[in-house]
Amino acid sequence: MKHIKLLAVIAAMTICGTISAQQTFFKVSYSNAAIEMKSGRLPVTENMNGLSIGVSQARPLLGELPFFYEYGVDVMAVFGDHNSTLVSAIVPVSLMYQLDLGQIQLLPFAGLNLTAHILGQSKYEGVTGDWFKSDNGDSAANRFQLCAQLGVKAVYNRYFLEFAYHPSQTNLADRTSLNLINVSFGFMF
């Protein structure tokens, strides 16, 4: 019984310590999505630009080391040539390291994100093509995609600037990848 009480106290202390030490980030991002289609000898790339908003929480790993794990959700809408539109929900999970440089903290991070594509379409000469429906025997694009993420946050007081690169780990469609670059500004609370 003493062991159970001791484990309960340790669990409560860990939970309370984690909750009090968490950092919540809110951000608005400029997003560039590069869709690269490899057909034939030359790849074709379509750059799509837009915005995303997101919220995430960073919690310290056990111990006094400056490592954190971060998880959150972003909603992204990007627009490209041929009246292309892509709307996605992104769930990032990453490991961060905190570097204190006086008044500025650098938080380099690496991890994975799961992307759920909500809407993907192109309009050409009055015809709208849905990326996620197979037409004329072509295979449809995948609604779910796994991406890596690499980046860094620079934090000053309660504000931060973030640069992140999200290379595709799974294809958007046959011989088609989607890579993202985000430049974000936000605040912590």
Which stretches of residues belong to each language-model region?
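Outer-membrane beta-barrel transmembrane domain signature
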Residues: 33-34, 46, 51, 59-67, ...
